[in-house]
Amino acid sequence: MAAPPRHEVELTSVTMRFDAADPGSLLPVLAKYVVLTRMDPACRNVDLCASVTAPGRYLLIQKWDSPDAQREHFDSATMIEMAEACRGLLSGPPDIDLWDGPSAHDLR
């Protein structure tokens, strides 16, 4: 019997690292962003992590259906609102990186 066909998963992952000048004010901004981003139909997942070794450092990990969906989100009102709300709350610009997922597979 032949093995079932493999289906390639197109997945775009993005990380955004924020170093807070005002952690108490930044955390609610990022938490709201996570909630709103999870409502986007093309968002596979988004997590907010707080560093254990660097207090005030936060990491957003996002997974998107496609590169186009990720780019569209970065131009969205949700992203713009979050970026504007971060003014004065960071010790420097966020570190944003785009990742390839060579080991990605769909759990559905």
Where does each model-flagged region fall?
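Residue-level signal for secondary-structure boundary sites
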Residues: D22-G24, D68, A104
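Short, well-ordered beta-strand segments in beta-rich or mixed alpha/beta enzyme
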Residues: E10-R17, D47-F74
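An amphipathic, aromatic/His-enriched active-site/gating alpha helix that lines ligand/cofactor pockets
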Residues: P5, P28, K32-R44, D65-D97
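Glycine-rich beta-strand-turn "strand-cap" elements at beta-sheet edges
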Residues: M1-V9, L48-G56, M82-R108
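Short flexible/disordered coil segments
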Residues: V14-M16, S76-A77, P102-R108
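Short, surface-exposed ligand-recognition loops at beta-strand->loop->(often short) alpha-helix junctions
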Residues: R17-L27
